[in-house]
């Protein structure tokens, strides 16, 4: 099956897409994850870790396709795959920044004993 390694919630959402679109979406998701993980070797995300961010990205792309269709522009998943890639990468960067802030907050928080002044 095309989506067997994908988390359940993401798989359920993706089942609404045409098979050809699924192939494109799967390729873009895996490329985005690989690209992100290779740039941030200190943090390695699995699909399960980034499922919500991928869903947000897919919904954003679906809305963009719809909005452009209303304006008379014919867009497809194939024509929007660059937008999908950049949207997923943006969501992952946002998640990474939040994770780094959380780590640093606990590490350098003077109220939890994280900072030693001696």
Language model segments and positions:
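Electrostatic interaction modules used in gene-expression and signaling proteins
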Residues: 1-118
């Amino acid at each position: 099956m095309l989506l067997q390694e994908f988390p359940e919630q993401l798989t359920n959402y993706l089942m609404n897409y045409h098979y050809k679109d699924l192939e494109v979406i799967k390729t873009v998701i895996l490329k985005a994850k690989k690209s992100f993980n290779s740039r941030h070797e200190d943090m390695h995300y699995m699909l399960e870790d980034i499922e919500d961010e991928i869903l947000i990205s897919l919904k954003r792309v679906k809305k963009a396709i719809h909005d452009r269709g209303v304006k008379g522009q014919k867009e497809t998943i194939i024509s929007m795959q660059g937008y999908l890639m950049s949207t997923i990468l943006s969501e992952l960067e946002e998640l990474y920044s939040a994770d780094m802030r959380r780590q640093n907050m606990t590490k350098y928080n003077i109220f939890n004993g994280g900072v030693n002044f001696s």
